[in-house]
Amino acid sequence: VDKPDYRPRPWPRPNM
């Protein structure tokens, strides 16, 4: 079974 090609979404940076 081939795993789905998911993209590593950028981590939400806190706006300080």
Curated annotation (Swiss-Prot):
Signals that turn on the gene: By bacterial infection.
Keywords, ordered alphabetically: Antibiotic, Antimicrobial, Immunity, Innate immunity
Domain of life per record: Eukaryota
Keyword Cell division: no
GO biological process: defense response to Gram-negative bacterium; innate immune response
Cellular compartments per GO CC: extracellular region
The UniProt record lists the keyword Iron: no
Function: Antibacterial peptide active against Gram-negative bacteria.
Protein name per UniProt: Metalnikowin-3
Annotated source species: Palomena prasina (Green shield bug)
